[in-house]
Amino acid sequence: MISGWDKALLFFSTIVPSKYDHVWFIEDDVFFLNEQVLTNLDLKYPNQDLIANCDFDKNNVNTTNVNSTNVGWVWPLISIKIEKPWYAGMMCAARLSNTLLQCIRWYASKYNTLFFLEALFPTITSHFKLSYINPIELTTVTYRDVFFLEEEEEEEEEDQKRLETYIFHPMKDLNKHLELRANK
């Protein structure tokens, strides 16, 4: 089955392969206050190949056999055709360089497949020795969290600063996205 992610990767790596130096990929349940959040990250990390919530921690990497459940993750369900180590992270909001996109294109062309994107982006980044950053602004891109933004409590100054500079996942209520943007 071809996913929206597959189509987006094909578009930016093959159809318009040199139009952009970097591309942000963002799922619909990701919240950020405005485009300035992304612009600030672009300015802060202009040369990174991967910006995402992935720490490349050696304790969370799959270096053992493919059937390992390693840290309780889904490694047994993923078929990766390149040598280890394999990494994983939250890719719901990630910026990829054209260089990384071309490496993903190479993998897709060579093996006629891709794999689970939460492992694909960081594993390809590591395999090709590309640059990456796990900025504090993306530490709120998580699997399942409830953020202060979704609660009815009084905002504190620190919360306001985070709202203006961080990216949040998941925020499933898209009406809350609109409400937060309208109130700022």
Language-model features, listed with the residues they occupy:
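Conserved catalytic core of nucleotide-sugar-dependent glycosyltransferases
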Residues: F31-S126, L178
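C-terminal catalytic/acceptor-binding lobe
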Residues: Y107-K184
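Short, hydrophobic/aromatic alpha-helical segments in well-folded domains
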Residues: A8-F12, F25, V37-N40, F121
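Extracellular/periplasmic catalytic domains that process cell-envelope and extracellular macromolecules
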Residues: P17-S18, Y45, Y87, D159-Q160
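Short beta-strand-to-loop acidic/aromatic patch adjacent to the donor-nucleotide binding site
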Residues: Y20-D29
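Short, surface-exposed loop and linker segments with low hydrophobicity and enrichment for Pro/Ser/Thr
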Residues: M1-K7, N47, D159-K161
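Structural recognition of the beta-strand scaffold that forms the well-ordered cores
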Residues: W24, L50-N53, N134
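Active-site-proximal specificity loops/subdomain of glycosyltransferases
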Residues: M1-K19
